[in-house]
């Protein structure tokens, strides 16, 4: 085990504070509509330009181990806010820095760190209660667009795209963000259920121009196993032919004489039929087939349930108004499933999302939920250069999470005003002793930091702006740093999701309180130079190659 260096008390906190300041100062320049960009060097490819706080925070690694510990703790604030609300990472970092700075002063003045922490916790509870009380539900499409615009740093086009996407796929739908191949940003919405499996044979194609199968009012056979034996299928095929309706077969695979017969009948006999492979693998495949069955009002044919293929009747098949199958995807629109059954399945998947600890599983469950409950919208972000597209994509990601958060918990005035108003509620807060009162005061002073920083980034005097905003009683009154005017921020469309502001203060206070109560820090001693260099002479490994 290598030797360790230990720092105590003021020395430890000073080093840690330096790290906190370095990270927070790099992140906070991005705050607000007039925030600046940060350029990140990449070991390969072009540098990355971003205005996303958490992306900047994740890129910072300091040489000094003790400073780095402070920086990493504040990075955790940004990451946690990004995970919980998807936005508000810069606000959380600015708040954490303000609380740590004020707290360190109080500890240096001889106050009890544990009582300070209790005071901070009390204050945060009161702030959260005030935010929830003043939160306003999002009702219109315009409000969703405003939230998206603010989060995308005033880009109204992004706000509009997100509002359209939310309108089309609903709150449960999935919105994905991709890089476009052109200059234009575009929105592509897939309604109904789509899965990434295409037709097994191109001979099933009905629309030769688009090379896809298009069926209206189709029956859907959902089978877990491979279909290779024709005799199993015959009774069902005969029943479907009599109805005159098309049949889509979703199975693990269709091969051998079963596939050959389907193709021949499709080409010669005019049997409207198409076969696709089942989506997913293993247990996930079973679940997805069950989803398709519930959506279409059919039954997933499985030998586990004791249903044999030759005994399948028309009543066991699913129905859909429209089915489209191309080389890579199958889309089922307007399935005939009962609304109550679909809602029960949605509730079940939501419960699984709550319980799962795996990010991968959560993502897959959310995809399944979207396919059942809403649809999938893809925003393709365009730009002139790769660097611009990546920067814009970061902003679209932020805005997408912010709009989701706004729909979940409502909105409050933006521009740091909601936190400023909450700070006024802390003046009369009851505490058990003076040190706890100081803890409350630390949070009260820190709550003005985001509004100050937004003003500073816009070239204004932060203290003057904060003073003027607090003079007015009106809750939504604040400073619009984009236009340089005061007014009702909600009417101006400057709004923040309550969830984003709430998670920012909770995460900032949580980590900051831990930093304040730190008394010792332990890190590995830096390695002595030369020992691990392998004895190579200076000037490169090969003689005579010094150009």
UniProtKB/Swiss-Prot annotation:
SUPFAM superfamilies: GroEL apical domain-like, GroEL equatorial domain-like, GroEL-intermediate domain like
Gene3D superfamilies: GroEL, GroEL-like equatorial domain, TCP-1-like chaperonin intermediate domain
Signal sequence extent: none
GO biological process: protein refolding
EC primary class: isomerase
Domain of life: Bacteria
Protein family membership: Belongs to the chaperonin (HSP60) family.
Protein name, per record: Chaperonin GroEL 2
Organism of provenance: Rhodopseudomonas palustris (strain ATCC BAA-98 / CGA009)
Gene: groEL2
């Amino acid at each position: 085990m290598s030797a360790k260096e230990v720092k105590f008390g003021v020395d430890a906190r000073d080093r840690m504070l330096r790290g906190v300041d370095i990270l927070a100062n790099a992140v906070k320049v991005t705050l607000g509509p007039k925030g600046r960009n940060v350029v990140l060097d990449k070991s390969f490819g072009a540098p990355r330009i971003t205005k996303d706080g958490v992306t900047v925070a994740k890129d910072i690694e300091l040489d000094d181990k003790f400073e780095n510990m402070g920086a990493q703790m504040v990075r955790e604030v940004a990451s946690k806010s990004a995970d919980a609300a998807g936005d508000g990472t810069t606000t959380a970092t600015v708040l954490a820095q303000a609380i740590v700075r004020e707290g360190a002063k109080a500890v240096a003045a001889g106050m009890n760190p544990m009582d300070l922490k209790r005071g901070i916790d009390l204050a945060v509870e009161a702030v959260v209660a005030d935010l929830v009380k003043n939160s306003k539900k999002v009702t219109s499409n315009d409000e969703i667009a405003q939230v998206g615009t603010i989060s995308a740093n005033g880009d109204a086009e992004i706000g509009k795209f997100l509002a359209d996407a939310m309108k089309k796929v609903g709150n449960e739908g999935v919105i994905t963000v991709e890089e476009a191949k052109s200059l234009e940003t575009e929105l592509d919405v897939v309604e109904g259920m789509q899965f990434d499996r295409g037709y097994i044979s191109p001979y099933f194609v009905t629309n030769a121009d688009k090379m896809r199968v298009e069926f209206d009012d189709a029956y859907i056979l959902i089978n877990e196993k491979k279909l290779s034996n024709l005799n199993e299928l015959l009774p069902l095929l005969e029943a479907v032919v009599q109805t005159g309706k098309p049949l889509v077969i979703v199975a693990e695979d269709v091969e051998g004489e079963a596939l050959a017969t389907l193709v021949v009948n499709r080409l010669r006999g005019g049997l409207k039929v198409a076969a696709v492979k089942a989506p997913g693998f293993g247990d996930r495949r079973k679940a997805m087939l069950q989803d398709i069955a519930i959506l279409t009002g059919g039954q997933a044919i499985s030998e586990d349930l004791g249903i044999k293929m030759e005994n399948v009747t028309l009543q066991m098949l699913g129905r859909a108004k429209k089915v489209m199958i191309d080389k890579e995807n199958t889309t089922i629109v307007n399935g005939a499933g009962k609304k109550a059954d679909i809602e029960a399945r949605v509730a079940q998947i939501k419960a699984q999302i709550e319980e799962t600890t795996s990010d991968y599983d959560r993502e897959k469950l959310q995809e399944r939920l979207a396919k059942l409950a809403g649809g999938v919208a893809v925003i393709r972000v365009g730009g002139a250069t790769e660097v611009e597209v990546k920067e814009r994509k970061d902003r679209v990601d932020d805005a997408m999470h912010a709009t989701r958060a706004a729909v979940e918990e409502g909105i409050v005035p933006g521009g740091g005003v909601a936190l400023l108003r909450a700070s006024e509620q802390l003046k009369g807060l009851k505490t058990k002793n003076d040190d706890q009162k100081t803890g409350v005061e630390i949070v009260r002073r820190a709550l003005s930091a985001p509004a100050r920083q937004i003003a500073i980034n816009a070239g204004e005097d932060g203290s003057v702006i904060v003073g003027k905003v607090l003079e007015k009683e009106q809750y939504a009154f604040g400073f619009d740093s984009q236009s340089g005017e005061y007014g009702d921020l909600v009417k101006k469309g400057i709004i923040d999701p309550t969830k984003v502001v709430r998670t920012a203060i909770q995460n900032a206070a949580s980590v900051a309180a831990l930093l304040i109560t730190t008394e010792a820090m332990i890190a590995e001693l830096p390695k002595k130079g030369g020992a691990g260099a392998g004895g190579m002479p200076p000037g490169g490994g090969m003689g005579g190659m010094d150009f």
